[in-house]
Amino acid sequence: MSMNVEAVMRAAPVIPVLVIDDPAHAEPIARALVAGGLPVLEVTLRTAAALEVMTEMKRVPGAIVGAGTVLDPAQLDAALAAGAEFIVAPGLTERLSQAAIASGVPFLPGIANASDIMRGLDLGLTRFKFFPAMASGGLPALKALAAPFGQCRFCPTGGITEASAPEWLAFDAVLCVGGSWVVGKGAPDLAAIEKAACAAAALRA
C-alpha cells in the first residue's frame, strides 16, 4: 500500500504506540486493533522483537504498519526491510530526514520547538509528531507553537490519555494523536484491546 504521511495521519484519530516483546502476540493484537477501527499501528523499535512484530502484523488485512522510535538511517533501512509502511522518529535530524525522504516512505519526525519545525520546513516537511507532548507543555504549548506555522499539522504523542485526547483532536492543527493507552503491557487481553480501539476510533472531534 502506498500512502503519503497525510493519509496515514488521517486514517484514524489515534495511532496506537506499541511496545511488544513477544512476536506471538503481534498478529492477534493487530487484528483486535484493526477490528476496533484503528488500522494505523506504530511498532516502536524499543524491543529486540520489533522488526519481527511488524512482519507479523502486516499479515492482518487492513493494517497499516509502521516503525516508531527510528533514530538513524540504519534503523530506517531495517524497518523498511521489515515492511514498514511509515516511519516515526522522536526527533528531527537532517541525516535521518534526508534518508527517509529519499526512500519515499511516509515520515513523521518529532518536534518540540520552533527551531525543530523550521529545520523540518527547510527539508520540505510539514507533518510532525509533537513529542513529548505533555512534558513539552501540553496543548497550550502546541497551540502557541503552531500559530506561526499555519502550513504544519501535528500528531501529539507522549502522556496523552483517552480522557485528554478529545481536547487535542479538537485543535485544527492536530490530525491524530499517538496513544500507548490502547494496548497494555504483558499478555494481551484481546477483547479489552478491541473495546479500547473502538472507543479511541470514536474520539474524532
Where are each of the predicted segments found?
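Short hydrophobic/aromatic-enriched beta-strand-loop microsegments
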Residues: 63-67, 85-91, 106-110, 127-132, ...
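Histidine/lysine/aspartate-rich catalytic loop segments that bind and position anionic ligands
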Residues: 93-127, 131-136
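Catalytic cores of alpha/beta
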Residues: 72-82, 115-123, 140, 160-176
